[in-house]
């Protein structure tokens, strides 16, 4: 009888040891899986944060390009208004000349002087507008390039 009890105790001890071993292995596997998941989540968060920082930098660069374009458009509007004011001045001078009587020589001298001033004004206006349009085109090109490169 004592042999049976000893045999049963041995079997019970072996089964208990196997169960404890299996439990320790299962816990170890679960722990490894949890650690792996934790490290994976941390890496994903780092990648997302880096992507967010990069996107924010790109948006700031685009905001700067937009601000530059707005300033250039504002300068174009100022030039446009300046040209309109000068054209109104020219029209006023034409009206003034037309309403007064001049001797032929005076009128020719006045006309030539007026023509020179008008040609010079036209050149100056064209140069200013050309420069402003070139700046605007450069900003537009930079903006398109930045958008294509960044998004």
From Swiss-Prot:
Superkingdom of this protein's organism? Eukaryota
- Give the residue spans that cross the bilayer: none
Q: Which UniProt keywords apply?
A: Chromosome, Coiled coil, Cytoplasm, Meiosis, Nucleus
- Gene knockout outcome: Abnormal linear element formation. Decreases meiotic gene conversion at ade6. Decreases crossing-over between ade6 and arg1, and lys4 and his4. Abnormal sporulation.
Q: What is its main location?
A: cytoplasm
Instruction: Tell where it localizes.
Output: Cytoplasm; Nucleus; Chromosome
Cellular component, GO annotation: chromatin; cytosol; linear element; nucleus
Q: Which residues form a coiled coil?
A: 56-140
Per the UniProt entry, what is one GO biological process? Answer: meiotic DNA double-strand break formation involved in reciprocal meiotic recombination
What the protein does? During meiotic DNA recombination, binds to and may help activate DNA double-strand break (DSB) hotspot sites.
- Subunit field text: Component of linear elements (LinEs), which are similar to synaptonemal complexes, at least composed of rec27, rec25, rec10 and mug20. Interacts with rec10.
What name goes with this protein? Answer: Linear element protein Mug20
The organism of origin for this protein: Schizosaccharomyces pombe (strain 972 / ATCC 24843)
Question: What is the name of the gene encoding this protein?
Answer: mug20
């Amino acid at each position: 009888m004592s042999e049976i009890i000893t045999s049963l105790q041995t079997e019970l001890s072996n089964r208990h040891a196997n169960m404890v071993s299996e439990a320790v292995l299962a816990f170890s596997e679960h722990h490894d899986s949890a650690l792996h998941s934790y490290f994976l989540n941390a890496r994903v968060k780092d990648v997302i944060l880096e992507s967010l920082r990069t996107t924010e930098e790109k948006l700031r660069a685009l905001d700067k390009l937009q601000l530059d374009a707005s300033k250039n458009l504002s300068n174009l509007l100022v030039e446009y208004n300046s040209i309109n004011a000068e054209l109104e001045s020219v029209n006023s001078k034409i009206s003034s000349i037309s309403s007064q009587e001049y001797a032929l020589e005076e009128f020719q001298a006045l006309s030539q002087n007026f023509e020179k001033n008008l040609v010079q004004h036209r050149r100056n206006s064209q140069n200013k507008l050309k420069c402003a349009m070139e700046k605007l085109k450069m900003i537009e090109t930079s903006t398109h390039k930045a958008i294509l490169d960044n998004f």
